Amino acid sequence: MQAALLRLASTEELLAPDENGVRLPAGFHSRIVVRSGQILFNYQWHAAPDGGAIFATEDAGWIYVSNSELDHNAGGVGALRFDHSGKLIDAYSILNNTNRNCAGGHTPWQTWLSCEEIAKGRVWECDPFGKKEGQVRAALGLFRHEAVAVDTINKQIYLTEDETDGCLYRY
C-alpha cells in the first residue's frame, strides 16, 4: 500500500482516460463502486456526493464516508463498508436531514465531522460505524462551513468558511 501511495504521489505522466474517464499513472486502474441513486444493501446512495474520508476497521477492512451536498434537509452522510479484500459488504446512512454537507474532517478519535455549507451552518460529529447518532458540535460555530482539520500536537481545531471573503478559524 505504501509503495502504491508513493507512486501515486510521484510526478508520473498520466495516461489517456480509462473506460471510466479517469486519467491515471501507469499501473493504476479505476472502478466505479457506486452511483448516486443506486441501492446497495437496502440503502440508496445519496446524490451530490462531496467531502469524504476513510476509516480503518478492526478486521483490516475500511469504511468510506461521503457527505451529500443537498438542500432542504435532504443532505447527510452515507457510509460504504469494505472488507479486507476491497469487497463492498455494507452501505448505510450515518447522518440525515441536514443541509449542504460539503466537506468536513477525519478526527484522530475516529469520527467524521460533517460541515454544513449554509448561512448558520453547523458541524455534525458522526460515527462512521453507524452505532451512534450524529451530534451537533455547537461550539464550532454557526456559519457557512467548508472543512475542518484537527491538530493533535497543538490541540487545535481549524475550520474554513466557504465565502469569497471567508475566514480560517482556530479553536
PLM region spans:
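Sequence/structural signature of beta-propeller domains
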Residues: 1-171
